[in-house]
Amino acid sequence: MAVYNYDVVILGTGPAGEGAAMNASKYGRKLAVVDSRRVVGGNCTHLGTIPSKALRHSVKQIIEFNTNPMFRQIGEPRWFSFPDVLKSADRVISKQVASRTGYYARNRIDMFTGTASFVDERTVEVVTPSGAVERLVADQFVIATGSRPYRPSDINFNHPRVYDSDTILSLSHTPRRLIIYGAGVIGCEYASIFSGLGVLVDLIDTRDQLLSFLDDEISDALSYHLRNNNVLIRHNEEYERVEGLDNGVILHLKSGKKIKADALLWCNGRTGNTDKLGLENVGIKVNSRGQVEVDENYRTSVSNIFAAGDVIGWPSLASAAYDQGRSAAGNIVESDSWRFVNDVPTGIYTIPEISSIGKNESELTAAKIPYEVGKAFFKGMARAQISNEPVGMLKILFHRETLEILGVHCFGDQASEIVHIGQAIMNQPGELNTLKYFVNTTFNYPTMAEAYRVAAFDGLNRLF
């Protein structure tokens, strides 16, 4: 058995693993990463963020071609199959893998392929695809193995008509009707993607409101636009059982309803990839969803083992995972690059997309904070009119007395880009976080960023 010695070993090469590896390598640590795939990137690159967002972009282009009258001079509206659209995602994945492989190579980071499990607090064994066993000994470890779709034991995911958010990327046909169970972020994003391809979608929500953590107005707007695109949303429903057929699937709900479709996409929760790590050998416990508990330093119950990314739960975003991994490594190398990641904007890539940061109206009302609202509707913005993207708005919540910005909520094209301007101002200390910044700053014209100025004036006009 080959034995290798390192300062730090990182399990996983997704955003959290990459963030940890790059930061630790900058401080001269001898590093190795372990991944079950022969290529880097983790589930984010191969099954999650990258393919789903590439799919969304392609579908958005199809919608633009089919609905913009200008394109009728070129030809009639076209129908595209899901497998054809998926090819664009494959190209993006290949480019991402090439880029990220270069990061590891330039930083002289050793890579091992296989399944890693802890032998003790200083040792992991890696079983390679060929069955060989290699042993890695290190002073510090970072668990960044990510997550996978949660699969209830009473649902047969081996049935050819039953998919989860990983296996849906192997769908070889375009269903006429699709049931999506679970109306969280992933469920809503795929509802947008498939409905944009003309698929009739039944979106089953176990709660009474879509994405209830959002501002109510934004959640309502999402519901409206999904319904406007022929998505049937069923709230407060839970499954009784799933019946697989040769030509489809029937979803039996506890309410007594039965829904038949060509396929079922299960999007109800995720579980941490911890079951094969041998955590019991080092005394690390996980919760019912396989997630590892960490402190504010991203340290587990074992002092030399850290964890970051989806494997620790909230917020389960690629952006946060990278910073969490970087912060975990910052603690290992005792640098000032550490911070607890809690200032995280929400980015939801539905059609139209959604992004927000800070408090929403319900939270501010419950806290009895005197706030006011400023809005800018995209239909009145010159840039949105030029790009033919009139749907959406920017909403700024601010303190009536101090003008401190308390929350920014955006719905529409480029929402996930627009929100960062508000985030930057909200992070300024003291009186520098003020609505006045937007009225005293000259924005390029025409731009979507100008919506901040419009919303700020709208909010100030409400004061008396």
Curated annotation (Swiss-Prot):
This enzyme's EC code(s): 1.6.1.1
Keywords (A to Z) from UniProt: Cytoplasm, FAD, Flavoprotein, NAD, NADP, Oxidoreductase
Cofactor(s) named in the record: FAD
Keyword NAD: yes
Ligand binding (FAD): D35, S36, R37, R38, V39, V40, G41, G42, N43, C44
SUPFAM superfamilies, A to Z: FAD/NAD(P)-binding domain, FAD/NAD-linked reductases, dimerisation (C-terminal) domain
GO biological process, one term: 2-oxoglutarate metabolic process
Matches recorded under InterPro entries: Class-I_Pyr_Nuc-Dis_Oxidored, FAD/NAD-bd_sf, FAD/NAD-binding_dom, FAD/NAD-linked_Rdtase_dimer_sf, Pyr_nuc-diS_OxRdtase, Pyr_nucl-diS_OxRdtase_dimer, STH_gammaproteobact
Any Pfam family the entry gives: Pyr_redox_2
GO molecular function, one term: flavin adenine dinucleotide binding
CC cofactor note: Binds 1 FAD per subunit.
Catalytic activity: NAD(+) + NADPH = NADH + NADP(+)
Annotated localization: Cytoplasm
UniProt enzyme class: oxidoreductase
Entry's Gene Ontology cellular component terms: cytosol
Transmembrane annotation, as ranges: none
Stated family: Belongs to the class-I pyridine nucleotide-disulfide oxidoreductase family.
Primary role: Conversion of NADPH, generated by peripheral catabolic pathways, to NADH, which can enter the respiratory chain for energy generation.
PANTHER family per the UniProt record, alphabetical: DISULFIDE OXIDOREDUCTASE (PTHR22912), SOLUBLE PYRIDINE NUCLEOTIDE TRANSHYDROGENASE (PTHR22912:SF93)
Protein's recorded name: Soluble pyridine nucleotide transhydrogenase
Gene encoding the protein: sthA
